[in-house]
A protein has these predicted regions:
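N-terminal signal peptide c-region/cleavage motif recognized by signal peptidases
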Residues: 5-7
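Beta-strand-rich domain onsets/edges
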Residues: 11-30, 106-165, 171-175, 225-246
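Short flexible loop/turn segments that cap and initiate beta-strands
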Residues: 43-52, 160-168
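Short, aromatic- and glycine-rich surface loops/edge beta-strands on solvent-exposed regions
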Residues: 87-101, 208-214
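Short, acidic Ser/Thr/Gly-rich low-complexity loop/linker segments typical of extracellular
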Residues: 176-195
Length: 246
């Protein structure tokens, strides 16, 4: 029972585009923004208004807060947004959500999240850093990946690698299509090496989240009490199956 409860507490901020590619026939990137447990297909947690939402492309940031549209998912507040790409190159969409109070863990949670969309085959800037307090720097280009490919990254905190950082990994299990034989399969866990570098082979086509978790500063919860906090640096990566020619 204790293990099941612990496994259920793996929160992930979703920032999912309709595709990891944008081009002449698909200039508009639609983003789905939900705070939930992706592998167990819920439950969904209430989101406050994000602190920051934008896109990094060509070394410059664009504030996209005005594009956020509030919606309800399973009765909880979530968001969506659309962005029309204007130039070739990798677009790093990012969000700094409002701190979330998790009573079961007695801590505030902030998961700084990003996803990379390649526009018009530009393929430059996929490892650009947003500058979050904790962030994963990809060593593997985070798109154009086949199922079974290995994703590698470095966990960074305030610009420095985090030795032996813990990374939680979950699959976006839409509709609960993947059966979970035991709670241990819900959230995969890997540790970075002494240089903050980690690797994971993605066994199924779809979206995968990599969440590097570190202890954050003391914060105040909704009741005004001083509590611990958890900072997460997340990146979403999609892999696809190889399909034979028809």
């Amino acid at each position: 029972m204790a293990f099941a409860a612990a496994a259920a507490l793996a929160h992930f901020q979703e920032l999912i585009p309709g595709s990891e590619f944008a081009g002449e026939d698909s200039r508009v990137v639609d983003l789905d923004i939900v705070f939930t447990h992706p592998m167990s297909n819920g439950p969904v947690m209430e989101m406050g208004k994000p602190v920051e939402f934008g896109v990094l492309v060509g070394g410059g940031k664009t504030d996209l807060m005005s594009s956020l549209k509030e919606k309800k998912v399973d009765g909880k507040t979530a968001y969506s947004a659309s962005y029309k790409v204007k130039r070739p190159g990798d677009h790093v969409f990012y969000i700094a959500p409002a701190p979330y109070w998790e009573p079961a863990e007695e801590k505030m949670i902030i998961h700084y999240t990003k996803v990379v969309v390649d526009a018009f085959g530009g393929e430059d800037g996929w490892d650009a850093m947003v500058g979050f307090p904790v962030e994963i720097k990809p060593l593997t280009r985070p798109y154009g990946l086949w199922t079974g490919n290995i994703f590698r990254g470095v966990v960074m905190r305030n610009g420095e690698p985090v030795p032996f950082a813990e990374i939680e990994v979950e699959y976006l299990n839409k509709g609960g299509e993947v059966a979970i034989p035991d709670d241990a399969f819900d959230t995969q866990v890997v540790k970075a090496d002494a240089n903050g570098t980690f690797a994971y082979a993605m066994p199924r086509a779809g979206w995968w989240a990599f969440a590097a978790l570190v202890d954050g500063p003391k914060m105040r919860n909704p009741e005004g009490k001083t509590v611990d906090s958890e900072l997460g640096g997340l990146i979403w990566v999609r892999c696809r199956d190889m399909v034979g020619k028809k």
